[in-house]
Amino acid sequence: MSKKTLYFLCTGNSCRSQMAEGWAKKYLNNNEWDVRSAGLEAHGLNPNAVKAMKEAGVDISNQTSDVIDPEILNNADLVVTLCGHAADHCPVTPPHVKREHWGFDDPAKAEGTDEEKWAFFQRVRDEIAERIQRFAETGK
């Protein structure tokens, strides 16, 4: 049986989609799912996303920041956009590709003190983890 492809998309493939990829690789059966992430642009892996995930016991430091690959997009089983910009500007997908939007705040745009910015990253990390755990348990 071939794996199903789950493709997480956001604007820059630096924070939210990277964290989602890391969590999905942790919570989903790797024999059943091929988990990928990409962005409308490739902004590079955000060091705070790596740090936040490491704090939670998930290593995403070897993941790469990539632009959307049309072949992966058009053959994915499920495409999940994680920000409104990606949802609005994501290329059209064929009818057989299921698309969902799971919106999360952008931790890279957090303002305030360093502590407040870090708390923002932690909150978004945990929200993404909860959403992916729910998907792993229910398929929804």
From Swiss-Prot:
List all disulphide bridges recorded for this chain. Answer: C10-C83, C83-C90
**Which Pfam family is one of this chain's hits?**
LMWPc
**What is the predominant subcellular site recorded for this chain?**
cytoplasm
Listed GO CC annotations = cytoplasm
GO annotation terms (biological process): response to arsenic-containing substance
Catalytic site positions: C10 (nucleophile), C83 (nucleophile), C90 (nucleophile)
Sorted UniProt keywords: Arsenical resistance, Cytoplasm, Disulfide bond, Oxidoreductase, Redox-active center
Can the keyword Cytoplasm be found in this entry's annotation? yes
The enzyme's E.C. designation = 1.20.4.4
Q: Does the keyword Oxidoreductase apply?
A: yes
- GO molecular function ontology, one term from the record: arsenate reductase (thioredoxin) activity
Judged by the first EC level, this protein's enzyme class is oxidoreductase
Q: What subcellular compartments does it reside in?
A: Cytoplasm
Catalytic activities: arsenate + [thioredoxin]-dithiol + H(+) = arsenite + [thioredoxin]-disulfide + H2O
Q: Which family does it belong to?
A: Belongs to the low molecular weight phosphotyrosine protein phosphatase family. Thioredoxin-coupled ArsC subfamily.
What is the role of this chain?
Answer: Catalyzes the reduction of arsenate [As(V)] to arsenite [As(III)].
Record's protein name: Arsenate reductase
Gene (UniProt) = arsC
